[in-house]
Every structure is written in structure tokens, then in C-alpha cells.
A protein has these predicted regions:
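A short helix-loop
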Residues: 2, 9-10, 17, 27-28, ...
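Short glycine-rich, Thr/Ser-proximal phosphate-binding strand/loop in the N-terminal lobe
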Residues: 10-49, 155-156
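Short beta-strand-loop/turn "lid" adjacent to the catalytic site in phosphate-handling enzymes
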Residues: 60-99
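Short, well-ordered amphipathic alpha-helical segments that serve as non-catalytic structural scaffolds
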Residues: 31, 50-66
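Conserved phosphate-binding catalytic cores of ATP/NTP-utilizing and phosphoryl-transfer enzymes
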Residues: 1-2, 107-135
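General beta-strand structural signal in soluble alpha/beta enzymes
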Residues: 7, 75-76, 109-114
Length: 225
């Protein structure tokens, strides 16, 4: 059995995965980067250092269960988005490891943006999996964008003009004393509020206005704080 290896070293997770020739995920492991309580993120050199330490741990585990000779190709995220100037040093950890593996195994190396991974992962298990034309919403820690996917290419057609939804949630979460990044803990709190009415409290937030496909979220941030 041959496998495709995927590597991603984004700002807050070190991730590797294997898929078989049918596209089924047969291995998927990740390590969340450590952020001290009260902080709103990591400096790039801190993230890079943690990725460099995490990758050997993940690969040691993977190669205990799979033979390196069965890897047919290596894919890696090398930048945040497919736009000019998009760059983060954190991705260098994954790119460096991917280059070494592909060269050692004499197999192809494919580079993608982190955003490509978000969009394709979301469409993979839907009726859009084989579609060549669709609109995707990308909500992450640093990005809130409306994207048009056409024939393998992404173009931005909308989004936020100021902060992203991820930044808004993380700022609220750290103010509440949660560990950054705060999305998962906030999800759990929101679920508890839905199931236990005594925990919920209504907050009147300003309406979000859209202009030519773009919005601003700073008004919500001001209302919350």
C-alpha cells in the first residue's frame, strides 16, 4: 500500500497525516503549541522552535506504524495564503522536513498554502469534493475570507477589513482567562450555555454591515469589551 504524507506547521499546531491511494486518512496526529496563560499568541521564532521539537516526536510515532518506503509523495504547507508577500517563518519547519524526506525517499514534493489545506479539507467529505467551482468561507485565527475556488485556484471575493473572527474570539477568550488559542474552550462554554439555560446571558451586539462582500468586526469587539 502506498501513501501520501502531509505536513503542516501553522502558528499553533504541528500536524502530519497519511492518506492511502483512495484518499482515506490512515494516520493523523498533531501537537498543539504551548502558549503561556494570559498571552495572545506566540512570536514566530517561538512557534518555529516548538515545531522543530514536535516534528521528530510525530514522525517517530508514525514510522513505528508505517514503512517510510511506502510513502509515494510528500505534501507540505509553505505559506499562509496564495497571495504575494504571504510568509511566516513557522512554515519553514515543515518545509525543511518535507524536503529532507522527499529527497531521501526520492519521491515528489508538493507545496500548498495553509489556506489550500483548509478549503480542500472542508470540501473533501462533501458533494463539492469533485467540483471545480464553488465558494468557500475561511474562518481561522488570522483569516476571515470569502473565497472563490475555480479549477484549482483560489481568489478572494470578500471577508473582513479589520480583525478576523478568530482574533475576536481569542481576545474574548484570553479576557475570560482561557488558554490561547481559545476556540475549543469557547465552543465548550457555548455548548454548556445551550444545554444549561442558567449559564446563558443575552448580549445585544451591533449588526454587522456588509459592503461589496466585506465587513468590519471591530464594532463587535468594542461592544463586548
Amino acid at each position: 500500500m502506498k501513501y501520501s504524507l502531509g505536513i503542516d506547521t501553522s502558528n499553533y499546531k504541528t500536524s502530519i497525516a497519511l492518506t492511502n491511494i483512495d484518499g482515506d486518512i490512515v494516520y493523523d496526529k498533531r501537537i498543539l503549541l504551548n502558549v503561556d496563560k494570559g498571552k495572545r499568541g506566540l512570536r514566530q521564532q517561538e512557534a518555529l522552535f516548538q515545531h522543530i521539537n514536535n516534528l521528530p516526536i510525530l514522525f517517530d510515532d508514525m514510522f513505528r506504524n508505517f514503512d517510510a518506503c511506502d510513502i509515494a509523495c510528500v505534501s507540505v504547507s509553505d505559506k499562509p495564503r496564495n497571495i504575494s508577500g504571504s510568509y511566516m517563518p513557522a512554515f519553514l519547519a515543515g518545509v525543511s522536513q518535507a524536503n529532507v524526506l522527499a529527497s531521501s525517499l526520492k519521491c515528489p514534493l508538493y507545496r500548498f498554502s495553509h489556506q489550500d489545506g483548509h478549503v480542500r479539507a472542508a470540501s473533501r467529505f462533501t458533494e463539492l469534493s469533485d467540483s471545480k467551482h464553488y465558494v468557500s468561507l475561511h474562518f481561522s485565527g488570522g483569516t476571515t475570507e470569502v473565497l472563490l475556488y475555480e479549477d484549482g485556484e483560489l481568489s478572494i471575493i470578500g471577508g473582513t477589513k479589520d480583525i478576523s473572527f478568530g482574533q475576536l474570539l481569542d481576545r474574548i477568550g484570553t479576557e475570560l482567562g482561557l488558554i490561547f488559542p481559545c476556540g475549543e474552550e469557547l465552543d465548550n462554554i457555548a455548548y454548556d450555555c445551550l444545554t444549561q439555560s442558567n449559564l446563558s446571558k443575552e448580549i445585544n451586539l451591533p449588526k454587522i454591515k456588509s459592503k461589496s462582500g466585506y465587513i468590519n468586526l471591530s464594532g463587535i469587539e468594542s461592544a463586548v469589551f
